[in-house]
């Protein structure tokens, strides 16, 4: 079990997802921005490993406009050495990595143009992880998508479109249950048709479910992760007090997290904390998890001095 948080470290004072307006696009602007983003990503990973935080979700904005037609720049070639160095660090310290495209990435859209944009966006995510030299345990997660007035047809369209995705994408894609439209049961049905692994979101399940116990859900989803996929990833959060249903808590509820950890023994999985204060909650969660025999991590880290390639 590894503990992680998504995209942003609020402590170290940099952002790995800096971007700019489309009208400002130019290769020099892209190079400058991406160089800064990659430097920040390295700093975040160092910080995390030193504190035994060995799961991290990389921001989708790492390479701005990478999937947009305006971007014809060979970012993989230009940043080959730095991407490889980051990948070497990730591998040497056994850090688990994921990415999560935004809610506008919809492969089951009724609009073919939206599907095509989504296909390119998913491919970009897979290419980032490939450029780092990471194996299939590094995943790209997404929601099933919209209902578009007919849930049965929309589920079928997801299955059909999944087969049209690039091989690089299918190699890394996982789907998660959401809190409004597609329950865990729906995601498991898609897995039966496609083989795509299912990531269990415990908070979403607490809102949209069919009465299934969390332990059973983790067993079912674990069975969808095969061979080189690694152990399952799980998203964890809880409801923010006084906010609309589905609002993520600003800081971890330690008692709730401790109960979650206790209830799920001995099942093993990596936990992504979708909580607003990011690394602060991750450190609190790691302090709880270190008492558990499933928790893994090692302190101390240095980046390779030379390009491993």
What is each stretch, according to the model?
Residues 103, 179, 204:
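Short, glycine/acidic-enriched loop or turn micro-motifs at the edges of active sites
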Residues 152, 175-181:
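Domain-core and long-helix interface of multi-subunit machines
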Residues 148-156:
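Loop-centered beta-sheet repeat module
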Residues 1-96, 103-119, 123-134, 138-139, ...:
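Alpha/beta catalytic barrel-like cores
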Residues 140-145:
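Short, charge-patterned binding micro-sites
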């Amino acid at each position: 079990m590894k503990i992680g948080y998504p995209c942003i470290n609020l402590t170290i004072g940099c952002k790995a997802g800096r971007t700019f307006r489309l009208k400002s696009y130019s290769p020099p602007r892209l190079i400058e921005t991406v160089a800064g983003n990659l430097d920040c990503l390295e700093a975040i990973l160092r910080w995390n490993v030193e504190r035994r935080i060995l799961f991290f979700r990389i921001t989708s904005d790492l390479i701005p406009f990478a999937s947009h037609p305006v971007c014809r720049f060979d970012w993989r070639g230009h940043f080959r050495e730095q991407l490889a160095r980051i990948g070497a660090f990730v591998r040497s310290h056994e850090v688990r990595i994921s990415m999560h495209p935004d809610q506008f990435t919809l492969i089951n859209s009724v609009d073919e143009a939206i599907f095509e944009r989504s296909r390119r966006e998913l491919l970009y995510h897979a290419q980032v992880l490939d450029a780092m030299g990471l194996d299939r345990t590094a995943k790209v997660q997404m929601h099933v998508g919209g209902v578009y007035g007919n849930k049965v047809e929309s589920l079928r369209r997801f299955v059909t479109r999944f087969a049209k995705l690039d091989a690089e994408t299918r190699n890394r894609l996982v789907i998660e249950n959401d809190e409004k439209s597609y329950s865990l049961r729906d995601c498991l049905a898609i897995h039966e048709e496609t083989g795509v692994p299912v990531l269990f979101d415990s908070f979403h399940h607490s809102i949209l479910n069919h009465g299934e116990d969390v332990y059973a859900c983790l067993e079912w989803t674990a069975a969808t992760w095969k061979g080189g996929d690694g152990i399952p990833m799980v998203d964890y959060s809880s409801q923010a007090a006084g906010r609309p249903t589905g609002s993520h808590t600003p800081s971890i509820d330690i008692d709730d997290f401790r109960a979650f950890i206790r209830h799920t023994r001995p099942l093993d999985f990596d936990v992504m904390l979708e909580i607003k204060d990011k690394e602060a909650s991750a450190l609190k969660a790691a302090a709880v998890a270190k008492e558990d025999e499933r928790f893994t991590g090692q302190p101390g880290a240095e980046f390779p001095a030379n390009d491993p390639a």
